[in-house]
From Swiss-Prot:
Its EC number is 3.1.26.4. Its cofactor is Mn(2+); Mg(2+). A divalent metal cation binds at D15, E16, D107. GO terms for cellular component: cytoplasm; ribonuclease H2 complex. This is Ribonuclease HII.
């Protein structure tokens, strides 16, 4: 049973989006909510419609005491692996907050080791901790927008549809057109595509 840490005024929630895709950055967000300005309907971003996510993202940015995004690029993911890159991107999001929190709640079961702030990992935190839900929404909206931009650059890959995840469609496009500079070379399907071209 999750309980909020006692004795801390400013608590940030942190989450990441984009561990599974074959392309682009892993994107994180850190959010400190305002207890006097609650937001209705916060939930795990994966369980919300796109329309609801966009509306909530605007409300979070408006009402939160502080929010920030972090990222680790595809080449960093290839260099240090996706887990380490996710943790690095989480640290970057926290360090970018305009107000530094007194405590950080991190989605999942690992805490970035270089946070320098007391922290706790919360499994399924994006469903049970409002701050982490808010972070998951901001990260998902930001990453989806990046995939839509990439889709405009490379329409033949259909990134707006699959958002870079290894769907049947994405794997077909990868086999047909090869890997882009934005693809994660350490991921098996990309490696395979690079060998074929």
């Amino acid at each position: 049973m999750f309980e909020y840490p006692q004795g801390y005024e400013l608590i940030a929630g942190v989450d990441e989006v984009g561990r599974g895709p074959l392309v682009g950055a892993v994107v994180t967000a850190a959010v400190i909510l305002d207890p006097n300005n609650p937001i209705e309907g916060l939930a795990d971003s994966k369980k919300l419609s796109e329309k609801k996510r966009l509306a909530l993202a605007d409300e979070i940015k408006e009402k939160a005491l502080a929010w920030a995004l972090g990222r680790a690029e595809a080449n960093e993911i290839d260099e240090i692996n996706i887990l380490q890159a996710s943790l690095l991107a989480m640290t970057r999001a926290v360090k970018s907050l305009k107000i530094q929190p007194h405590f950080v709640l991190v989605d999942g079961n690992k805490i970035p080791k270089d946070l320098a702030i007391p922290a706790q990992a919360v499994v399924k935190g994006d469903s049970i901790v409002a701050e982490i839900s808010a972070a998951s929404i901001l990260a998902k909206v930001a990453r989806d927008q990046e995939m839509e931009e990439l889709d405009k650059q490379y329409p033949e890959y259909a990134f707006a549809q699959h958002k870079g995840y290894p769907t049947k469609l994405h794997l077909e496009k990868l086999a047909e057109f090869g890997a882009l500079p934005q693809h994660r070379r350490s991921f098996a399907p990309v490696k395979k595509a690079l060998e074929q071209f």
